[in-house]
Amino acid sequence: MISILVSRFLLAALVLQYATIDAVNYCNLPCRGDRFHVGCGESAFAQECGESPETLDLLKEHTDEILSKINDVRDHVAKGSWGLPMAARMKVVVWDEELARLATRHTKGCLAETHACRNTERFLFPGQLNFEYTDDKLPQTKELIDAAIKKGHLQKHNISREIIESYKDNGPDGDVEELALALSDRVTAVGCGLTTWQDGAKARALLTCNFSSQNIWERPVYKIGNSPGEKCIEKDETYKNLCSASEPIDSNESN
């Protein structure tokens, strides 16, 4: 019965996502300063995209790969691995089509860093990670995804309890931004996009993932517990140290 209810919840959420995407006028959403919204205006490739730019569809096998890798590391850390504290209420991350569409729009600029805002009506402070790839030729999409995830996973050597308790994007041993964002207990959803293009003799790609929330400087990455998921209403059946996908966590609240 529980699994049926969870399935219905996820289906309803997916229907709501598509309805939201079609209804929102991103040009009307507030942006700080003089920045523009990435979802506003025509969805065209930027001049920086060189020759033959193409946005690649992420298939179910790709989105499943992204979600499984993120949830694997969340589940691993939630139980206190890598010398990090246990997480009291970290939930399973799900795919979000609106975040994915905005991530795709971002990749069509062919620049990892832009000043465009990406907030939505549901997610006021979304986080973002970018992975750039340059080589003589591009690998398969799955290999690009795996390379991006590996880059973030290697930051386990840099992250510490002190960073979990009071976030900074760099530890004594290096950058932790990618891994720390994947571990935020306010992150409930993710959506990614991928664009490739030719830059002279080099093939290039930009993979962007938008997260439903972002870490706040000197605030906890996640709430610490005495046992994994001790504050969960219900644990996930697969990722047993995480809350289920139906856990009512507000991505817009801060720790």
UniProtKB/Swiss-Prot annotation:
GO terms for cellular component: extracellular region. Belongs to the CRISP family. Keywords: Cell adhesion impairing toxin, Hemostasis impairing toxin, Platelet aggregation inhibiting toxin, Secreted, Signal, Toxin. Gene3D superfamilies: CAP (3.40.33.10). Residues 67-211 form the SCP domain. It comes from the Eukaryota. CDD domains: CAP_euk. A motif (Cell attachment site) lies at residues 32-34. The keyword Secreted applies. It is found in: Secreted. This is Tabinhibitin 2. Inhibits platelet aggregation induced by all agonists tested (ADP, arachidonic acid, the thromboxane A2 analog U46619, thrombin, and snake venom snaclecs (TMVA that activates platelet through GPIB, and stejnulxin that specifically acts through GPVI (GP6))). May act by competing with fibrinogen for binding to glycoprotein IIb/IIIa (ITGA2B/ITGB3). Its main location: secreted. InterPro entries: CAP_dom, CAP_sf, P14a_insect. Residues 1-23 form the signal peptide. The keyword Signal applies. GO terms for molecular function: toxin activity. Expressed in salivary glands. Pfam families: CAP.
